[in-house]
From Swiss-Prot:
Subcellular location: Cytoplasm
Protein name in UniProt: Alanine--tRNA ligase
Organism this protein belongs to: Prochlorococcus marinus (strain NATL2A)
Listed GO MF terms: alanine-tRNA ligase activity; aminoacyl-tRNA deacylase activity; ATP binding; tRNA binding; zinc ion binding
InterPro entries named in the record: aa-tRNA-synth_II/BPL/LPL (IPR045864), Ala-tRNA-lgiase_IIc (IPR002318), Ala-tRNA-ligase_IIc_anticod-bd (IPR018162), Ala-tRNA-synth_IIc_core (IPR018165), Ala-tRNA-synth_IIc_N (IPR018164), Ala-tRNA_ligase (IPR050058), Ala_tRNA_ligase_euk/bac (IPR023033), DHHA1_dom (IPR003156)
């Protein structure tokens, strides 16, 4: 019998919040430090989002960072989309989930981890021991012995598994180890003779214990770690399913209120609706939690990286809403419920509520504008007797209507139709480069000598706030990513010193430039980055020899720092002006501060007007002229936030922060360099405002010395234009407008002439029309004529040929520019009455050339992208029409 004091067979029904609290409190009582959930935007550049509870501790497991505590416990919010097609369709797949975990960093190991896991499961959550099955790695005899002899689990309820299931590693090299998993058995009455843990109708894994005790080297050998670690994870949603006695995670109190709210909006009942509707409602409930947290943590919808994931989830919510009958906008309404459900565990949701709801409102309204048109086009495509949506059609849905490829695939699959993925990717490659999504695995492999060695240095002392020069000692030199003792003239190097005045690239501000010198040495520093608090100076040795442990003079270029500093302070003023002039909910989505200019990205539903831009510019220049003192303070982050300081979404801050305060105007958490008075900026000028993604705008501006450069460049351009147009500077606009009108008129004349030539050429082709039964059919290749010219020619030929006539043209309008194809089909009214449809016919022809299109029954146009297939497509069109007209 298991050694457990649990006498209750039926576990209590705890809410999701109660389960979370019980887990955390249990480990706090066992001397674990409670840690708040990390952001969904991880520090780790190898992953887009936080995908596991252990991800925030990766540097500790790698030995790159010391832990502040030997034991920790947390409830970590996570996002995974690699199994998105299973969300809503299985009992336990989610995009957003919470992972409860307890961690040991070289402190306790297997015995304690196993005992506490059992105690928590049977005494805190009061699970019946007969409902628990244990899996162990088949070679981990130590863990199996602890389960049997210390905990007292019956041998027939301990299952030995292979490395594929019970040996944890996430790369070819690095820390790894066996794991042991706890499964809940919903049907213990079936006995333990033939336990199949793959049977998810009977078993659910709810707790995973990873014993990180080895390091795998490049040859695959396992060496014991000097310090062994414990990494565990309990899925909150899974434990809620068990304790609340539900058949799936979705019907727990963590998610079901969202599902029920969506059902009410759809005017259906979840309990009695069909399986398809239930799946859609589950997807809506799951995705709502995900998008709410993503926006809260600073992600904005876009076509790149994290933004693309957010946009994809939002658009799937909208589409599944329509599938169950929700036509009106509903995302903000549902997000309010999500915030209410999760506010106790994540109070920042309330703080960011306005931003979350506004982002969802903007993105939903934008997508609804195009969704209906896109759905109609997709319905038209799939209504034909076809088994494949071409890559060009899928790309048109993506590029024109905002349909993610996955959404097109999902709709097509529901109709039993495939999508040409390769064709879509070819179209994408021609027109747009999109950032590749990072791997969803956690990489704990060897990171290369420079990353490993740099992490071993002491922190660099930064003195650049107070001065631009300092004497320092060289403590590290890297050449070709290898540590060296010295570097000579011409060598590209990375240099680490014990102290530096050089600002390292961070917070949107670029790194300083300057020189490192000694008696005969000169190194040009072109950029400075930092890893944690170790500054890495990249540059080239101009003269002399750079040696380890040598004393050097560090010199930042003053003019470079002055320009960068001016643009950084101006960035703070710009954000304040945006909030005052546009909306207080405007927030920073990204920035770049260089010596030439500043770039500021922010959320906004529409372009700013000229007047809004002028008002902001005037407001900022007024603040500059008022000569405000800029105060820089260091204080606890809680005190700074209470005082109203702004923090950038997605940025990581410590317990103590640096605050840049322009009293009454701006207060931000910032580690960048700034002027001491606003008057030092001189002038501020906005040079551009544009959209970079749906709901995201970008302002480019300049301040300080950069403004003079800008006006000098503009003056030179004006002088050159005046000289070229032979007019005074004030007459340039009028002259350009006049030339534009002339060009427009000439273009119209050219099109007219080309169409007349096409018509004349086409009428000359009338003799090539062949008789097919009672009909006349003309199919020809006609290059050098655009779509409108071909349509005009085809219409005239129909009139010329008379009743029962059909004309098909295909060609390359302009081979000098590209090889894009254009097709035109024209049918006489009597052929249309007989059932022929020009739009459908020409669409089928274009598909053979990687294109698509359509139009009216009597006249239609399509395009293509594969000129090598043009002649064959026209030949097939001839065969098809000849057969139909015979």
């Amino acid at each position: 019998m298991e050694k457990s004091s649990s006498s209750l067979i039926d576990p209590p029904s705890l809410s999701g919040d109660e389960i979370r609290d019980a887990f955390i409190n249990f480990f706090v009582q066992h001397n674990h430090k409670k840690l708040a959930s990390s952001s969904l935007i991880p520090d780790d550049p190898t992953v887009l989002l936080t995908i596991a509870g252990m991800l925030p501790f990766k540097p500790i497991f790698l030995g790159l960072k010391e832990s502040s505590t030997p034991r920790a416990t947390s409830s970590q919010k996570c996002i995974r989309t690699n199994d998105i097609e299973n969300v809503g369709r299985t009992a336990r797949h989610h995009t957003f989930f919470e992972m409860l975990g307890n961690f040991s960093f070289g402190d306790y190991f297997k015995k304690e981890a196993i005992q506490w896991a059992w105690e928590l499961s049977t005494e805190v959550f009061r699970l019946n021991p007969q409902n628990i099955v244990i899996s162990v790695f088949k070679e981990d005899l130590e863990a199996e012995q602890i389960w049997k002899e210390v905990v007292g689990v019956d041998a027939n309820r301990i299952i030995r598994m292979g490395a594929a299931d019970n040996f944890w590693s996430s790369g070819a090299t690095g820390p790894c180890g066996p794991c042991s998993e706890l499964y809940f058995d919903f049907k213990p009455e079936l006995g333990s003779d033939e336990i199949d843990l793959e049977d998810d109708s009977r078993f659910i894994e709810f707790y995973n214990l990873v014993f990180m005790q080895y390091n795998r080297d490049l040859k695959g050998n396992l060496e014991p770690l000097a310090n062994c670690h414990i990494d565990t994870g309990m899925g909150l949603e899974r434990m809620a399913q068990i304790l609340q006695k539900k058949s799936n995670n979705y019907e727990t109190d963590l998610i079901f209120p969202l599902i029920n709210a969506a059902a009410l909006l759809a005017q259906i009942k979840y309990e009695t609706t069909n399986k398809k509707n239930k799946t859609s409602l589950k997807i809506i409930g799951d995705h709502c939690r995900a998008v709410t947290h993503l926006i809260c943590d600073g992600v904005s919808a876009s076509n790149l990286g994290r933004g693309y994931i957010l946009r994809r989830l939002i658009r799937r919510m909208i589409r599944h809403g329509r599938l169950v009958g929700i036509i009106q906008p509903f995302l903000p309404q549902l997000a309010e419920i999500a915030i209410e459900l999760m506010k106790n565990a994540y109070p920042q949701l309330l703080e960011k509520k306005k931003i979350i709801l506004n982002e969802l409102k903007i993105e939903e309204s934008r997508f609804l504008e195009t969704l209906e048109r896109g759905e109609k086009l997709l319905a038209e495509i799939t209504s034909h007797e076809c088994d494949l949506i071409s890559g060009a059609q899928a790309f048109e849905l993506y590029d024109t209507y905002g349909f993610p490829l996955e959404l097109t695939e999902e709709i097509a699959n529901e109709k039993g139709i495939s999508v040409d993925i390769n064709g879509f990717e070819n179209e994408m490659a021609k027109q747009r480069k999109r950032a590749k999504e990072a791997s969803v695995s956690i990489d704990l492999t060897e990171e290369g000598s420079i990353e490993r060695e740099i992490s071993l240095f002491d922190d660099t002392r930064f003195e650049g706030y107070e001065k631009l020069e300092t004497t320092s000692t060289v403590i590290g030199i890297f050449k070709n990513n290898e540590s060296v003792k010295q570097a000579v003239q011409g060598d590209l190097v990375k240099i680490i010193v014990n102290r530096t005045p050089f600002y390292a690239e961070s917070g949107g501000q670029i790194g300083d430039k300057g020189l490192i010198t000694s008696q005969d040495l000169e190194v040009s520093v072109e950029n400075v980055r930092k890893k944690k608090n170790i500054f890495i100076h990249s540059g080239i040795v101009n003269t002399g020899v750079l040696e380890i442990n040598s004393s050097v003079q560090m010199n930042v270029t003053p003019s470079f720092r002055q320009r960068t500093t001016s643009n950084h302070t101006a960035t703070h003023l710009l954000q304040s002006a945006l909030k005052l002039s546009i909306d207080s909910s405007v927030s920073q989505r990204g920035s770049l501060v260089s010596n030439h200019r500043l770039r500021f990205d922010f959320n906004a539903p529409k372009p700013l007007t000229i007047k809004e831009l002028e008002d902001m510019e005037a407001r900022i220049n007024q603040w500059i002229n008022e000569d405000h003192l800029i105060q820089i303070k260091t204080m606890p982050i809680k005190e700074a936030m209470a005082a109203g300081a702004l923090a950038m979404f997605g940025e990581k801050y410590g317990d103590v922060v640096r605050v840049v305060d322009v009293p009454g105007i701006s207060m931000e958490l910032c580690g960048g360099t700034h002027v001491t008075r606003t008057s030092q900026l001189g002038t501020f000028k906005i040079i551009n405002e544009t959209g970079i993604a749906s709901g995201i705008r970008r302002i480019e501006a300049i301040a300080g010395p950069s403004v003079l450069d800008y006006f000098n460049e503009r003056d030179l351009v004006v002088k050159e234009l005046s000289k070229s147009f032979k007019v005074q500077s004030y007459e340039i606009v009028e002259r350009v407008s006049s030339l534009q009108l002339e060009l427009k008129d000439k273009t119209k004349e050219l099109i007219k002439v080309k169409n007349e030539l096409a018509l004349a050429k086409a009428l000359g082709l009338a003799t090539y029309a062949k008789s097919v039964g009672k009909s006349k059919l003309l199919i020809r290749r006609l290059d050098g004529v655009d779509g409108s010219g071909l349509q005009s020619a085809a219409s005239s030929l129909i009139d010329h040929l008379g009743k029962y006539s059909a004309v098909i043209f295909g060609g390359i309008p302009n081979q000098e520019i590209d090889n894009k194809l254009v097709f035109v089909a024209a049918f006489s009214p009597d052929l249309v009455s007989d059932g022929l449809h020009a739009g459908k016919f020409i669409s089928g022809v274009a598909k053979m050339c990687g294109g698509g299109g359509g139009g009216r029954p009597n006249l239609a146009q399509a395009g293509g992208s594969q000129p090598q297939s043009l002649d064959l497509a026209l030949e097939k069109a001839n065969e098809n029409l000849t057969q139909q007209l015979s």
